[in-house]
């Protein structure tokens, strides 16, 4: 196998994730590269083929019915490694950012102090077709949280600092694919997970389940929850199916639901069951 240092070919204007300025492998990459070095000849190629077969069998694809020229979703055998201390800083910053966005939503759908004080231009909100005036709470009990999901696009600049490219708050996709990719990688390259302290993702699923349950009305001990999908023609239908299984909730379409007296019910063979919260 050729020198792993030869894998790095970043231009001078870009940050080299693998190699330092002194041409040495960064410490947090040494574990995974050591595992790859230890594989027998052709081992990595065989692992990649195995992973791709698993993804095909599980149906982990992105439907490209509207764009036949779009590239397919492919498996990258080399995971992106982030040092623990660096991830801790990223995590803290993203939590703070998500909390800020949630408080902004709570204000816009509540007292609207940001508009009254001129910190946010009123026309920016009222002229936006996505602003749901009927959901504004002027009296009564407001939701404990408005932003249930949050994703972000990050980029690292040449100086090594991370910057936010875009915030995604309207049903961001990708979590299901990340979970499936981790599962397949763990089965295809188990040596890495035995020798490297990898942070597991199960807690993410558990917390997501708990956050959905928290959206149910007060006093509901065992809320009925579901994942709502547009159907099998959706570009991310695999993710909807996968998340429903991981969250242990039913996958439903619009035709499975009915509304009576402003309450959503899930239609079943025998009766209709009140739906307390859902992921869409």
Question: Which residue stretches match the model-derived regions?
Answer:
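Preference for protein termini
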Residues: 1-279
